[in-house]
């Protein structure tokens, strides 16, 4: 029926503002399309492992929001950039994260299209909010590693265009990093 994405969006907005709404909508749509997996979580008692999983998923989602922005910076989705993200997810988070990450990215691309139709600055505002949350919750070193990942996405197709460079500088500033750090990585 598609109700999970709207419920997730509303709850996400109440809990985390615009970024929370986007995250809730995307995660809710995953439940809508994959309802067999959604039922497996009922009845589980919260444990330390589920707290870690929640933190991991929160970081993974923020990372993918930023990755989607860099991938689409030049107006197209390149196979080489998507393949770079798949390899990174596989080596960092395991095979299960590859499919989950790809679904999230595809949902983010679709969400961006819808947001851009209503307000061309809406997704950019989401990126700013995401960067602010990342700056508040990650150490300098972790933010720098995330920036390296984003720069490598831009480089993965063999050419870093001006739009990608500007998007990288923008993301760096939102995450509390210097534009010079982006320039040194290119």
Task: Put a short name on every predicted segment.
Residues 1-72, 76-186:
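Small-residue-enriched hydrophobic alpha-helices in membranes
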